[in-house]
Amino acid sequence: MFNRILRAFRNDISLYGELKGNPEFASESWMVLTISIVISAALATLTIIGDGVLTGIVWGVISALGGIFGYIVLVVLAWLIGTKLAKGTGSITDIRAAVAYAYCIPAILTPIPIIGFIASLWLLVTESSAIRETLGIGKGLTFLIVMLSIGAILVYSVIVSGALMALMTTGAI
């Protein structure tokens, strides 16, 4: 499992051919995704806990929900656009597994200041490779899928940040 995570982080595109159609890796990818989101949420909590324990916990929960939302949006968009419009080959399970491995290390590093920004940029590269290799589609379409998912994640971030700021302003948090 850890070898596959490192291969995805190194952007070893041969990994995605091995993952495709293999039910063992499909179930293992759930574990990979869960571990990465939990660690990312814990790091997000620790980076802001100086502002108060409750604020840190809320930030960690928001981080976890954002990670889950981002993953789901990317997988669904990749599947819909990649298989229905572009006629790529690959099941939603194949896409889900490939994206989970590519998502892992950058998702863990994202809450860490400065390193997180670099990890976010690298996440774009690894996710693009995972989608492109799993579905067998072109770079342009892969870029579109990733950009649409980023747009959805930005909308999510603005809504959640606005709600959080409103709660903090009213003293609820």
Give the positions of each predicted feature.
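N-terminal juxtamembrane cytosolic/stromal segments of multi-pass membrane proteins
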Residues: 1-39
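Membrane-interface segments at transmembrane-helix boundaries
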Residues: 6-8, 78-101, 132-139
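Helix-boundary and loop/linker segments of multi-pass membrane transporters
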Residues: 18-23, 50-53, 135-136
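Hydrophobic alpha-helical transmembrane segments in multi-pass membrane proteins
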Residues: 28-76, 97-127, 144-171
